[in-house]
């Protein structure tokens, strides 16, 4: 059995080596000729999987190690009887921790002592948005949820959701929707001229969902105005050919890596491995946890005199500080458009190991229950 797999999916040999022969490929440039004799295709979000790629091939199962599926023509796969699986929620914790780190930096930038005084509007409350909401609420943030499809589908919970206009009134607006172009609530360019005009200079806009959810040209125009909001982008229109003018205008810019924790990537591999085993009728014998290495940083300590918010934010940034990825991206965005695109992909391919907060043991000496609860809300392991 031949498995053609994106070379950037981790632990391919560990999970799939005893199922079939593995052929590693560049997912961005994958061609029909490279998959014509494959039985299994494993991809990430950079590969468009449709009739053009797979017609006439032997492929009978497609797995994407991502939460998003807008790069997969699921209707065509179903018509052809080709099995399919994604990895919903695999990196939800990673993205939520990314947003929390951004919030900690934003509070510092604005001189806000109590970061939980910020109101946060979450647009898109699926696996990622839901995980973020749970963390924020445990940290005593005021959170407003906007998800029209869920609001309509879940009548018993309809009152928990607010319209987009109300979410846009929050101090922080963070986007976590899938990319959809049809239906009653398409998200393609959902945030455009009028929505951006509603955001002022005392607000923060974060996009760690899909680049095309924001109209890039409208955003660039808005950022050239004196009263523009502060903007953080992890995802971009037209990746990997991102707009360098937009890059220059945003506060923090990262190369689509919010979900790139080691745990998140390994869970993505594990989920498509499990789905393939079910498809083939094989027993599931492996779990991501058995392959996790010891973290480079395993412990931090705080005394009883530590300020609660400051201690939590120090530990959070010890695990992940987005300023490092921002600096790397800006340094590589030189040269012609093709060179910049290659640099963007290279940053993602060669991304350094990043661990989630659950990998870090926090020692608290003489601490209050309040600070213990705050650390637990984010997933840290406590030693009291």
UniProtKB/Swiss-Prot annotation:
Biological process (GO), any one: pyridoxine biosynthetic process
Binding site for NAD(+): 147, 177, 234, 259
Catalytically driven reaction(s): 4-phospho-D-erythronate + NAD(+) = (R)-3-hydroxy-2-oxo-4-phosphooxybutanoate + NADH + H(+)
Matches recorded under InterPro entries: D-isomer_2_OHA_DH_cat_dom, D-isomer_DH_CS1, D-isomer_DH_NAD-bd, Erythronate-4-P_DHase, Erythronate-4-P_DHase_dimer, NAD(P)-bd_dom_sf, PdxB_dimer_sf
Gene Ontology terms: cellular component: cytosol
Record: residues binding substrate: 45, 66, 260
One function term, GO molecular function aspect: protein dimerization activity
Protein's UniProt keywords contain NAD: yes
Predominant cellular place of this UniProt entry's protein: cytoplasm
Localization per Swiss-Prot or TrEMBL: Cytoplasm
Annotated keywords: Cytoplasm, NAD, Oxidoreductase, Pyridoxine biosynthesis
Record-annotated disulphide pairs: none
Pathway linked to the protein: Cofactor biosynthesis; pyridoxine 5'-phosphate biosynthesis; pyridoxine 5'-phosphate from D-erythrose 4-phosphate: step 2/5
EC number, as in UniProt: 1.1.1.290
Pfam families, per database record: 2-Hacid_dh (PF00389), 2-Hacid_dh_C (PF02826), DUF3410 (PF11890)
Active site: 210, 239, 256 (proton donor)
Subunit composition and interactions: Homodimer.
Entry similarity comment: Belongs to the D-isomer specific 2-hydroxyacid dehydrogenase family. PdxB subfamily.
Stated role: Catalyzes the oxidation of erythronate-4-phosphate to 3-hydroxy-2-oxo-4-phosphonooxybutanoate.
Full protein name: Erythronate-4-phosphate dehydrogenase
Organism: Marinobacter nauticus (strain ATCC 700491 / DSM 11845 / VT8) (Marinobacter aquaeolei)
Gene that encodes it: pdxB
């Amino acid at each position: 059995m031949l498995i053609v797999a994106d070379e950037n999916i981790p632990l391919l040999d560990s999970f799939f080596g005893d199922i079939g022969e593995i052929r590693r490929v560049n997912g961005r440039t994958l061609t029909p000729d490279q998959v014509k004799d494959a039985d299994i295709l494993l991809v990430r979000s950079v590969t468009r999987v449709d009739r053009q790629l797979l017609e006439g091939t032997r492929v009978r199962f497609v797995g994407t190690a991502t939460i998003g599926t807008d790069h997969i023509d699921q209707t065509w796969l179903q018509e052809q009887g080709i099995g399919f699986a994604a990895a919903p929620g695999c990196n939800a914790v990673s993205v939520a921790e990314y947003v929390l780190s951004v919030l900690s930096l934003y509070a510092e930038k604005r001189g806000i002592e109590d970061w939980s005084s910020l109101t946060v509007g979450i647009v898109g409350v699926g696996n990622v948005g839901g995980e973020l909401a749970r963390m924020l609420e445990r940290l005593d943030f005021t959170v407003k949820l906007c998800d029209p499809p869920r609001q309509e589908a879940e009548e018993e919970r309809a009152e928990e959701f607010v319209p987009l206009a109300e979410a846009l009134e929050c101090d922080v607006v963070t986007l976590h929707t899938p990319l959809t172009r049809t239906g009653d609530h398409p998200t393609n360019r959902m945030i455009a001229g009028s929505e951006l005009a509603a955001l002022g200079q005392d607000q923060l806009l974060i996009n760690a969902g899909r680049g095309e959810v924001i109209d890039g040209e409208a955003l660039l125009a808005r950022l050239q105005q004196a009263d523009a909001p502060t903007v953080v982008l992890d995802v971009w229109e037209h990746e990997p050919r991102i707009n360098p003018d937009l890059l220059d205008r945003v506060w923090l810019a990262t190369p689509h890596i919010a979900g790139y924790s080691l745990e998140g990537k390994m869970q993505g591999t594990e989920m498509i491995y499990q789905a393939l085993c079910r498809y083939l009728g094989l027993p599931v014998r492996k779990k991501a946890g058995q392959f996790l290495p010891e973290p480079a940083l395993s412990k931090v300590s705080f005394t009883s005199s530590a300020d609660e918010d400051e201690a939590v934010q120090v530990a959070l940034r010890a695990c992940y500080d987005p300023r490092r990825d921002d600096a790397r991206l800006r340094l590589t965005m030189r040269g012609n458009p093709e060179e910049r695109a290659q640099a963007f992909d290279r940053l993602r391919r060669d991304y350094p190991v990043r661990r989630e907060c659950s990998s870090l043991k926090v020692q608290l000496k003489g601490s209050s229950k309040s600070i213990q609860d705050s650390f637990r809300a984010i997933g840290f392991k406590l030693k009291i």
